[in-house]
From Swiss-Prot:
An annotated GO BP: negative regulation of DNA-templated transcription
Keyword Transcription regulation recorded: yes
Keyword presence, Repressor: yes
Species of provenance: Bacillus anthracis
Superkingdom as given in the UniProt entry: Bacteria
HAMAP family: HrcA
Gene name in the database record: hrcA
Name of the protein in its database record: Heat-inducible transcription repressor HrcA
């Protein structure tokens, strides 16, 4: 159990190191307004904190830096919520004011904005389409031969594709098809659409659409959509600006991993609900042993739909990043409920 004095000194060391990236010595601490102890007392407490494994000495300086154990204690017990500037709150909320909530577009933009606000790497795992339910279908003619099919799900995912309209299918047929599809398929999981169309809907269409065979062929292409999650990155190269990663050998394996999107897909798809913080070697990947990964899930009710994560050095601005992720996931969840 740490004393109040040790808690204050540990928190001040970590806060200072997060901001400066420089080892912290007793002289630096003695100049802090919140530290009212003598240099000798500070040195003694730092020695005890080092012996307990919360801070450690570097080879190049007489100062101390937080250890992984120190960061973990800091995150679990010392972290205070950070109020975000109003302009950042407005910037984030503006993402989610669109009348039609396009989850994939928002996910992509979220990754970019988060990377800019933090100067770290942002990763967003979009909703898994197979668990979405169809909300509605639109088929908008462009000319006599082509149209745009727009599929909207209950989570706000919008999938559009250009389709070829057979000459034998007229506008009246298109309108009847869309009405039948929306009446019969609204609320059906995307993973079941194809089977339901060809086991049930075709029978209904036969009684309403003149050129039945051509219409069915067109429908087959319309509902061939990818069902797996998409992963979006923002600021892939941001880690290069962090002093911890100026060593080219250290950063090469990390950048290789970031470029291998499938590896991050596996890391993020099984995240637990809520905010999760993995520090250093708590991460399963060796390339991330000098990094922290903070992730947050967004959901509707009890259904987890996706994950937003920030990858940075262990010397990360934990409080700020957590506040940003909480705001993003709150806005994302509210947007999906529209």
């Amino acid at each position: 159990m740490l004393t109040e004095r040790q808690l204050l000194i540990l928190q001040t060391i970590i806060d200072d190191f997060i901001g400066s990236a420089q080892p912290v010595g007793s002289r630096t601490l003695a100049k802090k307004d919140e530290i009212t102890y003598s240099s000798a007392t500070i040195r003694n407490e730092m020695a005890d904190l080092e012996e307990l494994g919360f801070i450690e000495k570097t080879h190049s300086s007489s100062g101390r830096v937080p250890s992984e154990k120190g960061y973990r204690f800091y995150v679990d017990h010392l972290l205070a919520p950070q109020n975000l500037p109003n302009d950042e709150i407005v910037q984030i909320k503006d993402l989610f004011v669109e009348r039609i909530f396009e989850a994939e577009k928002i996910a992509q933009q979220s990754a970019q904005i988060l990377s800019e606000l933090t100067n770290y790497t942002a990763i967003v795992l979009g909703p898994k389409l197979s668990t979405n339910k169809l909300k509605n279908v639109q088929i908008v003619p462009l000319d006599r031969q082509t149209a745009v099919a727009i599929i909207v799900t209950d989570t706000g995912h919008v999938q559009s594709k250009t389709i070829t309209v057979p000459e034998s299918v007229d506008l009246s047929d298109l309108e009847k098809m869309v009405n039948i599809l929306n009446e019969k398929l609204s609320g059906v999981p995307m993973s079941e659409l194809h089977n339901k169309i060809f086991k049930e809907i075709v029978t209904v269409l036969r009684g309403y659409v003149h050129n039945y065979d051509s219409a069915i062929k067109m429908l087959d292409g319309t509902f061939q959509v990818p069902l797996s999650e998409k992963i979006y990155f923002g600021g892939k190269a941001n880690m290069l600006s962090q002093p911890e990663f100026h060593d080219i050998h250290k950063v090469r394996s990390l950048l290789t991993m970031i470029d291998n999107e499938a590896e991050f897909y596996d890391i993020l798809r099984h995240k637990q609900v809520g905010i999760q913080v993995k520090i250093g070697r708590e991460n399963s990947a060796t390339a991330m042993e000098d990094c922290s990964l903070i992730s947050a899930t967004y959901s509707i009710g009890e259904e987890q739909l996706g994950t937003i994560a920030i990858l940075g050095p262990t010397r990360m601005q934990y409080s700020r990043v957590i506040s940003l992720l909480q705001l993003f996931t709150r806005q994302f969840t509210d947007g999906l409920k529209k």
